[in-house]
Amino acid sequence: MILGEIMEVLAFKNQSLIDHVNDMVKYWERIKYRYLKTIKRALEALNIKLDIEKVDEFMKILIKLHDIGKASKIYQRAIINDQEKLMGFRHELVSAYYTYHILLKKFGDKNLAFIGALTVMLHHEPIIMGQIRNLKKKELTAEVVLDKLKKFDGMIEDFEDLIKKLIGYSIGDIIKNDSNKDDIIRFVIEMSVRARHTPNSEKLRFIVGTLLLPLVMCDYKGAESREGKAPKFAEVLEVESYVI
């Protein structure tokens, strides 16, 4: 389902979050039959069994929520006003927090929610890992998480309405509407530790990699209508979508 206009929450300076999500969903509808069975088999590696319709629903939730962290006050201030700075803030860490809780509510499976949230958290992996290396760290440590979220000061006033339009749930029925920064920091640190030290870490990386390809493809395709220079990944996108 393509979403109607809600409010002017921006994903990019020249594209609203809703328009970005709509374009991503449209592109997913074009390519999904190439990926649904592969994703289904990948999830089965961790004994997560979903039928094709549920896999489709799962992926659409990732698409709709992957940038929900951009509905944070700090991000909207920075994108509207060039004088405002993000100060290292990474929206995907906030997106992962909400994605986990919404997936858990929707599917009732902690492992599936974790995988989905981790995928969302890593959908800009080259950026965040590059920033970590600049801090002379090798991984998403507590210190790094604190640095990336230190300026986070909550979500926009109409966040609950935005979530309800995107996924049909009231966020107040799932978690606190204006989650405490400490809650998000604690969650991201726990995710990072679990991802590195789980006994099934190799399977986990395989599954997340399987999910990241179509998610990132849709993300870049969904940004095509914005003004500005096309991202380099667009070259990969053209190869992947050539026969569609």
Swiss-Prot record:
ssDNase activity requires Mg(2+), ssRNase activity does not require cations. A second loosely associated metal ion is visible in the crystal structure. Keywords: Antiviral defense, Endonuclease, Exonuclease, Hydrolase, Magnesium, Metal-binding, Nuclease. One of its GO terms (molecular function) is metal ion binding. Optimum pH is 7-9, varying somewhat depending on the substrate. One of its GO terms (biological process) is defense response to virus. Changing H123A: Very little nuclease activity. Mg(2+) binds at D67, H91, H123, H124. Its EC number is 3.1.-.-. It is an enzyme of class 3 (hydrolase). Residues 10-221 form the HD Cas3-type domain. InterPro entries: CRISPR-assoc_Cas3_HD, CRISPR-assoc_Cas3_HD_sf. Both ssDNase and ssRNase are inhibited by EDTA. Belongs to the CRISPR-associated nuclease Cas3-HD family. Monomer. Proteins of this family have an N-terminal nuclease domain and a C-terminal helicase/ATPase domain. In some CRISPR/Cas systems the domains are swapped, in others they are encoded separately. This is CRISPR-associated endonuclease Cas3-HD.
